């Protein structure tokens, strides 16, 4: 009777405690998780028909580069690591889904006890095993105990806490997927930039070799004219110095070519090898099928913006789960009752949400600025290419005229040197501008989602 009274008192106190906790009200959190508001326009006219990102194998129409991209997606170590992070997030998602399901446990146990002869249990057992007691009721010595246990437990999601945890896990898994897509976009664009810069270096080498042949021819001509008394040693030395300068630039260019080839091999996850590539003239003919869209609308395609948005959704779900954790949990099992509430992330979740919101707005702002900068730079670069090509043609014509006039002794060697230097500088700059234009198109493609 005493035991029953004690149980009733404990149960009554526990019930009133549960009722009291149920009457508590969790503090309200301000729903400040709006999406970032971006400008409607920037003064330019865009083609708003482009609403989906191009796949990488459509944007990059060079079959050689496409083959390298496929190898990189299979072998690149950094990309493999990002894929493993997705696997980890998927495992956490499965765990969060399991929280909504009942837990069933099965246990098997066995033990052997031998009681000492002069202990309380040993003496008690010897007195219990009297001859008048049936044999099957005797306590064996040693005493063997076998057990089979089955238990059941299920936490009812009455406040939505477990559902919110599942939503947070789903959002974080989606964020990890977006992070992997971003890693793929970065990998492909970085590989393409190195590839096109390598093609530009090939063209620079061709131009430098042509300039070296021309400077050597001029050097030999001035030496011959000096022997005839028509030129001075100063002219010979100037042309000789120019020839040596171009040889030095050729060595530097070859070094850069080797570095680019090794960088590409590293992105492919293989040891260095000779990289096959198209010619510079073929590169000029390949289109980059990227329509121009409103940056504010296109930002939704960026994996980093989508990942930040998923993190924001996850943090909001964490806040709701923390609010639900403020209330007691109802756990159904072998017996019914209320567990004490778990404060858990109650104090940290709101701050985490504000951090995620701030990071989301920061990511969106940086993304918008990056897209606009690249778009404007691309427009300017196209005009620079046009002007530089006209300038290069004019310098090339000047070189031809200067050489002819020098042979006729109408101009001195300084005019010839000056014309050749201006043409070489203009041609090298033209190659750099075209290569940089390709790089900006690739970066703009990545900034608008990168085909993910």
Where in this protein do the model-derived segments appear?
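Periplasmic alpha-helical coiled-coil/stalk elements that build and connect Gram-negative outer-membrane
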Residues: 25, 171, 178-294, 401, ...
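Small/polar (Gly/Ser/Thr/Ala-rich) solvent-exposed segments
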Residues: 80, 103-123, 133-142, 147, ...
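Transmembrane beta-barrel architecture of outer-membrane proteins
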Residues: 65-67, 88, 145-147, 193, ...
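Membrane-embedded segments
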Residues: 84, 88-91
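Short segments within alpha-helical structural elements
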Residues: 216-220, 245-273, 322, 390-448
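Amphipathic alpha-helical coiled-coil scaffold segments and their short linker/junction regions
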Residues: 49-50, 58, 65, 69, ...
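C-terminal structural cap/anchor segments
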Residues: 349-387
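Terminal intrinsically disordered/low-complexity segments used for targeting and assembly
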Residues: 1-74, 254-300, 446-452
């Amino acid at each position: 009777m005493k035991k029953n009274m004690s149980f009733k008192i404990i149960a009554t106190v526990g019930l009133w405690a549960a009722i009291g906790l149920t009457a508590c009200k969790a503090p309200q959190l301000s729903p400040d998780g709006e999406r970032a508001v971006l400008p409607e326009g920037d003064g330019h006219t865009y083609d708003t028909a482009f609403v989906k990102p191009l796949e990488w194998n459509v944007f990059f129409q060079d079959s050689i580069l496409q083959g390298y991209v496929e190898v990189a997606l299979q072998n690149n170590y950094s990309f493999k690591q990002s894929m493993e992070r997705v696997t980890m997030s998927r495992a956490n998602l499965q765990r969060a889904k399991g929280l909504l399901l009942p837990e069933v446990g099965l246990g098997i146990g066995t033990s052997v006890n031998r009681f000492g002869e002069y202990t309380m249990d040993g003496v008690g057992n010897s007195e219990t095993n009297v001859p008048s007691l049936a044999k099957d009721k005797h306590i064996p010595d040693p005493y063997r105990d076998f057990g089979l246990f089955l238990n059941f437990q299920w936490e009812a999601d009455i406040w939505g806490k477990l559902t919110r945890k599942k939503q947070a896990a789903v959002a974080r898994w989606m964020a990890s997927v977006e992070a992997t897509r971003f890693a793929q976009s970065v990998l492909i664009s970085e590989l393409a930039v190195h590839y096109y810069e390598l093609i530009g270096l090939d063209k620079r080498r061709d131009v430098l070799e042509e300039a070296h042949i021309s400077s050597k021819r001029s050097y030999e001509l001035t030496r011959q004219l000096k022997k005839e008394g028509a030129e001075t040693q100063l002219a010979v030395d100037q042309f000789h110095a120019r020839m040596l300068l171009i040889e030095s630039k050729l060595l530097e260019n070859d070094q850069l070519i080797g570095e680019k080839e090794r960088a590409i091999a590293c992105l492919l996850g293989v040891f260095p090898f000779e990289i096959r590539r198209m010619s510079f003239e073929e590169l000029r003919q390949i289109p980059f099928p990227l329509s121009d869209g409103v940056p504010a609308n296109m930002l939704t395609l960026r994996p980093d913006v989508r990942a930040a948005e998923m993190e924001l959704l996850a943090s909001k779900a964490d806040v709701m789960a923390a609010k639900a954790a403020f209330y007691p949990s109802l756990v159904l099992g072998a017996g019914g009752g209320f567990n004490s509430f778990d404060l858990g992330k109650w104090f940290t979740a709101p701050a985490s949400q504000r951090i995620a919101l701030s990071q989301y707005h920061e990511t969106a702002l940086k993304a918008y600025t990056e897209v606009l900068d690249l778009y404007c730079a691309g427009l300017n670069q196209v005009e620079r290419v046009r002007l530089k090509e006209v300038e290069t043609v004019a310098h090339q014509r000047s070189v031809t005229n200067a050489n002819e006039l020098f042979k006729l002794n109408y101009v001195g060697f300084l005019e010839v040197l000056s014309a050749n230097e201006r043409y070489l500088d203009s041609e090298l700059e033209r190659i750099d501008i075209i290569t940089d234009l390709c790089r900006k198109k690739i970066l703009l493609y990545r900034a608008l989602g990168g085909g993910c």
